UniProtKB/Swiss-Prot annotation:
It comes from Thermoanaerobacter sp. (strain X514). It is found in: Cytoplasm. GO terms for molecular function: metal ion binding; threonine-type endopeptidase activity. The active site is at 5. CDD domains: protease_HslV. This is ATP-dependent protease subunit HslV. It catalyses: ATP-dependent cleavage of peptide bonds with broad specificity. HAMAP family: HslV. GO terms for biological process: proteolysis involved in protein catabolic process. Pfam families: Proteasome. Keywords: Allosteric enzyme, Cytoplasm, Hydrolase, Metal-binding, Protease, Sodium, Threonine protease. One of its GO terms (cellular component) is HslUV protease complex.
Length: 176
């Protein structure tokens, strides 16, 4: 079983950044890859997704989400709700172990493994093994510094990588 990842989304003003670490872990004690890319731009670069969980499952869900974005003209919320409904109804999709964070210029959404779509109260959301560490760090930085979203996301992941053994500091950041 592949596990471990940290993904963080940070929104501030008109900017939103999504960052992820690069580590893929197999079992409890084997690092298979240090430089994996877990952040993707979709729908002509207007949407950014970050995924955590089983690698194959996360890629499958990311692909399904991209199809829904195309089907619904880039409407992030509609695509997320439609994906969640399909996720809950489909016997194969229900077994997938993954989480997605999806952002566009207006919205930040968490699409959960139970087929739920959650719009966070805060301008920061984290998922994966180091998600809570990164989220706490990002919230502190977001409200107490003048750093921009890219710097907050990167610094939050650096902090999480010092705490979570399933998170490394090989960080990818995408910004809208």
């Amino acid at each position: 079983m592949f596990k471990g990842t940290t993904i963080i989304a940070v929104r501030k003003g008109a900017k939103v950044s999504v960052a992820g670490d690069g580590q893929i872990t197999f079992g409890e004690n084997t690092i298979l890859k240090h430089g994996a890319k877990k952040i993707r731009r979709l729908y002509n670069g207007e949407v950014i997704v970050g995924f955590a969980g089983s690698v194959a499952d996360a890629l499958t869900l990311s692909q399904k989400f991209e199809e829904k974005l195309e089907q619904y003209g880039g409407n992030l919320k509609r695509a997320a709700v439609e994906l969640a409904q399909e996720w809950r109804k489909d016997k194969i999709l229900r077994k997938l172990e993954a989480l997605l964070i999806a952002v566009d210029k207006k919205d930040t959404l968490l699409i959960s493994g139970t087929g739920e779509v959650i719009e966070p109260d805060e301008d920061v959301i984290g998922i994966g093994s180091g998600g809570n560490y990164a989220m706490a760090a990002a919230l502190a930085l977001r409200y107490n510094t003048d750093l921009d979203t890219e710097d907050i996301a990167k610094k939050a992941l650096e902090i999480a990588s010092k705490i979570c053994v399933y998170t490394n500091n090989n960080i990818t950041v995408e910004t809208l």
